[in-house]
Amino acid sequence: MSMATIARPYAKAIFDFAVEHHSIEHWQNMLAFSAQVSAHKQVTQWLSGVMHSEKTAQIFISLCSDHLDEFSKNFIKIMAQNGRLSLLPEVLKQFMALRAMINSVIDIEVFSAIPLNEDQKKKIIFALEKRLQLKVTLNCKIDESILAGVIIRHGDRVIDGSVSNRLKRLKNFLLS
């Protein structure tokens, strides 16, 4: 079974709990910190060792105590009992995906040769939100190889409005 498949029910359970208790931000922060702790090299080695789950939970909770309330501690105990503390980074990833879905927000990558100004970003966001009927956040990256224009990417969808792409198409047309 993949890590995502195993992590999904944990993420769904705590996401539903967080929504019900109006504490999504708290749970995301707790998961982010706990996932960072569990991904630390020494902690990863320790988690892979054989140890009683109650003791594992106690030690892990003590490492993260400033970021945990009673509900979070219970969640960590359940994860430890099931030997799943090493999955916290994947649980966080799934939790954030659920949060994005409920807010109908999608993250779009935009590649440009130079940094986009705020007006350009607003125009791109407006056009994409109108087309996709979802709230859009941009993840802007610089790629000087495109020369000018932008490449917009979401999942397997790509809108290539770059000069380098236009030059390639012109070259192919002239060679044919």
Swiss-Prot record:
Xref: Pfam families: OSCP
Main localisation: membrane
Keywords: ATP synthesis, Cell membrane, CF(1), Hydrogen ion transport, Ion transport, Membrane, Transport
SUPFAM superfamilies linked: N-terminal domain of the delta subunit of the F1F0-ATP synthase
Gene Ontology cellular component annotations, sorted alphabetically: plasma membrane; proton-transporting ATP synthase complex
Membrane topology value: Peripheral membrane protein
MF term (GO), any: proton-transporting ATP synthase activity, rotational mechanism
Function: F(1)F(0) ATP synthase produces ATP from ADP in the presence of a proton or sodium gradient. F-type ATPases consist of two structural domains, F(1) containing the extramembraneous catalytic core and F(0) containing the membrane proton channel, linked together by a central stalk and a peripheral stalk. During catalysis, ATP synthesis in the catalytic domain of F(1) is coupled via a rotary mechanism of the central stalk subunits to proton translocation.
NCBIfam families: ATP_synt_delta, PRK05758.2-2, PRK05758.2-5
Family in the record: Belongs to the ATPase delta chain family.
Protein name: ATP synthase subunit delta
